[in-house]
Amino acid sequence: MLRASILRASPAVRPLARQTRPQWRVVQRCYADNKNLGETAVPNPAPTVTPSSTEKATIPSSDIPKPPPAPETAGASRSAPTIQPATTPPTGPGSASIAPDPKQPKPKKKGRIRRLLFWLTILSGLGYAGGVWYSLVSDNFHDFFTEYVPYGEDAVAYFEEREFRKRVPWPCWDSPRLQPQNLVRRTSSSILRPQWAEWRVLPTRATATSGTKGPHTIANVQEKKQEAAQTATVVKEEAAAPAPAKPVNHLDHLAVPDANDAVVQDVVKIVNDIITVINADSAHDGKYNSALDKAKSELGRVVSDINLMKANLRKESEEKVKSAHDEFEQAAKELVQRLDHQMQAQEAHWKEEFENERERLSQTYKDRLRSELEAAEKVYEQKTKNELLQQSIHLQKSFTASVRERVEAERDGRLGKLNELSSSVHELEKLTAEWNSVVDANLKTQHLVVAVEAVKSALETQATPKPFVTELAALKEIAADDPVVSAAIASINPAAYQRGIPSPALLIDRFRRVAAEVRKAALLPEDAGVASHIASLAMSKVLFKKSGLAVGQDVEAVLARTEVLLEEGDLDAAAREMNGLQGWAKVLSKDWLGECRRVLEVRQALDVIATEARLNSLLVD
């Protein structure tokens, strides 16, 4: 139906087509899926013409345009009635009707989406058809429709081709040269499409004046029919009387030996095609020879100019590229050298700054240490001087008093109390001897305290258990006559000072490993078997681990409290907590408790020795 309506409307738009045909020749449209404005479609593209194949270029006789048919034939073809197909089948004359079944279910209502899609499809098809029709009428809308609407260019090209075939009924339309699939693209710099120019011009006056019905030709229908009949009679008479044959001067084809450019080759091919067409026309009488000779000479000159320009441009471009390459290499070398110098200078600057900063920090710390040492020495010296000064003042006063008393006594007794003086001297000697014993006792106490601190320091600073037999022997030698110190040393387990005791950090690390094993056996009874061990191991994985000073006597609470006490440094309380375990938990922690016991024994002995030394110093005072 759409094609029929377009065919009926085509006679009305033919005057517009004649007016807009020059515009179509200027605007080079290409019929393809992707439209490129810089390319032009050419039917049956000719191969590239080379100088060797220029002389062989010919046009087959089937491609030479033939004269159009007589006006009567064209008019008859245009005035042929169009048979419209039946759109609806005839209905029968019967009037019988059948009542609907009362039990028939109600038809289901169709969805809105289906109806929407149906009407949307119909409206889209109608809009697309209207766009195609209006594109055949308006040039501006034609450009818009073919460029922005999908497949619009193909649809418009199809109807334009049908209309053109209807106006120009050539027998050569079946040639594969003008098939749409043989259209190729050519750049906009090439010459306007010669093949399309041929079939645009070929419709003659007879076709243009064929029986079209328009508003500007209705009044002169009879006159045009008479003129068409007279023209047909004249054509028949001319065809009946053949003209005498005249000798035909064939033109030579154009041969350009240096035509390496594709555009020049296309121009050569076009000129050769024109020469072939002229040679096929027997009535040219050599009137195109001068124009073609001039065109050949001009084309040769243009080709030589193009080759010369190409050579000059190639030479200039090579020189520019070479100079640019040299400049780039020179700039790159300078840049590399400059970067090397900058990096070396930066590295030297950083080294110098690093050395200066290191020296400054070292000097600063040395000055600070020196100032602190000097301040401490000054304080100590001043304190010592003050004490010595006080003692000297006290001794001077006491000596002055004693001298005064003795002088007075001598004055009073006139050397009568020499016995008292001698007794005083004996008492002074005795007091001096007693003070010597006190000083010796203080030195012994200090040595004992230093030895105890040495043992404690050796035990606290060790990373792994080490024997401390040497320190203990020195302590025993210093306190050889003290029974309390000897008893305290004898109470230490020999394995403790021969193998060493672990530090608090090692005890905590050992406790964490023991705690993991104790948790696995937390749920075991005393007479547990293999199954009980496996069950306890499985249940220990799902038990919640307590933390902090947990309340309770269960294994998890005891382990949590022990860990907190160990972190606080209370080893005695931690050992007491672990000693309160029962069953397999106590058995597994037995070795750890033994180590804790040895550590506590050593600590207790050292505390007793330190207390004894402190007590001796107090008794001496």
Curated annotation (Swiss-Prot):
InterPro entries: MIC60 (IPR019133). The keyword Transmembrane applies. Its main location: mitochondrion. Component of the MICOS complex, a large protein complex of the mitochondrial inner membrane that plays crucial roles in the maintenance of crista junctions, inner membrane architecture, and formation of contact sites to the outer membrane. Plays a role in keeping cristae membranes connected to the inner boundary membrane. Also promotes protein import via the mitochondrial intermembrane space assembly (MIA) pathway. It is a single-pass membrane protein. Belongs to the MICOS complex subunit Mic60 family. It is found in: Mitochondrion inner membrane. Residues 311-388 form a coiled coil. One of its GO terms (biological process) is cristae formation. Residues 40-64 have a biased composition (Low complexity). It comes from the Eukaryota. The gene is MIC60. One of its GO terms (cellular component) is MICOS complex. Residues 1-31 form a transit peptide. Pfam families: Mitofilin (PF09731). This is MICOS complex subunit MIC60. The chain crosses the membrane at residues 117-137.
